[in-house]
A protein has these predicted regions:
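Short, Lys/Arg-enriched N-terminal segments with co-localized hydrophobic residues
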Residues: 3-22
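Conserved substrate/cofactor phosphate-moiety recognition/catalytic segment
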Residues: 44-82
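P-loop (Walker A) phosphate-binding loop of NTP-binding proteins
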Residues: 30
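NTP-dependent small-molecule kinase module
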Residues: 156-225
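Conserved lysine of the Walker
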Residues: 35
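A glycine- and Lys/Arg-enriched "phosphate-lid" helix/loop adjacent to the NTP-binding pocket
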Residues: 109-181
Length: 225
């Protein structure tokens, strides 16, 4: 059995053997899946620089949940720009980073979902797609993407526990549609990725659960399976 310290050493050695001086990990998943919590815990464990989804300072998010059709395009463009800037920062510096949600989730899940629900016009959606296509040519995917797979009851429970006022109006059908799109997206995602089933995990409070996730990440990076 390899101890935790040995795994950390192996993980760091992999980074240097790959001939790179930085690692980009990304945490993906639906609203309430635990992305931000896991990002924080992993950033402390690996001493990586965390990059969080800009939610609290987002000038559109509260308006969006009150009137999705009116503010959907504004919100998605804001997120697209914020995540693009994060990727530009990664390319400029030599720091290892861990990212809370990716630019691909915006383009392949949230924006198409809003369009299919009639909450984003075809004109706005096509404009969004053109912007993303231009951006995507200038950035690389993360070295490892960790997808947190969660059921609707698990998502709802987490959303209720964190108590964000603007999330009170999130509809169940909205979460279901997002979950369906996440599953479709991850099944066709080609770069290196890892799927974690989180319904029966409490990595925020249980160190063994967190340790199990860390072991899977390190094994994936090191090519142990």
């Amino acid at each position: 059995m390899i101890c935790s310290f040995q795994l950390i050493v192996v993980f760091c050695n992999v980074i240097f053997k790959r001939g790179v001086d930085k690692m980009h990990l990304a945490i993906a998943g639906n609203i309430g899946s635990g992305k931000t919590t896991l990002t924080t815990l992993l950033s402390k464990h690996y001493k990586f620089e965390p990059h969080y989804e800009d939610v609290e300072d987002n000038p559109y998010i509260s308006d969006f949940y009150e009137d999705m059709q009116r503010w959907s395009f504004n919100l998605q463009i804001y997120f697209l720009n914020a995540r693009y800037n994060t990727l530009l920062q990664l390319q400029k510096n030599k720091k290892n980073i861990i990212q809370d949600r990716t630019i691909y989730e915006d383009a392949h899940i949230f924006a198409p979902n809003l369009h299919s629900m009639g909450l984003m016009s075809t004109r706005d959606f096509e404009t969004y797609q053109k912007i993303f296509e231009s951006i995507s040519q200038t950035v690389k995917p993360p070295d490892l993407l960790v997808y947190l797979r969660a059921s609707i009851p698990h998502l709802v429970n987490n959303i209720q526990k964190r108590g964000r006022d603007y999330e009170d109006s999130i509809r169940l059908d909205y979460l279901r549609r997002l979950n369906e799109r996440y599953e479709g997206w991850i099944s066709s995602y080609k770069p290196k990725h890892l799927i974690i089933e989180v319904d029966n995990l409490n990595f925020a409070e249980n160190s063994e659960h967190l340790g199990a996730i860390i072991s899977k990440i390190e094994a994936e990076v090191n090519g142990l399976f």
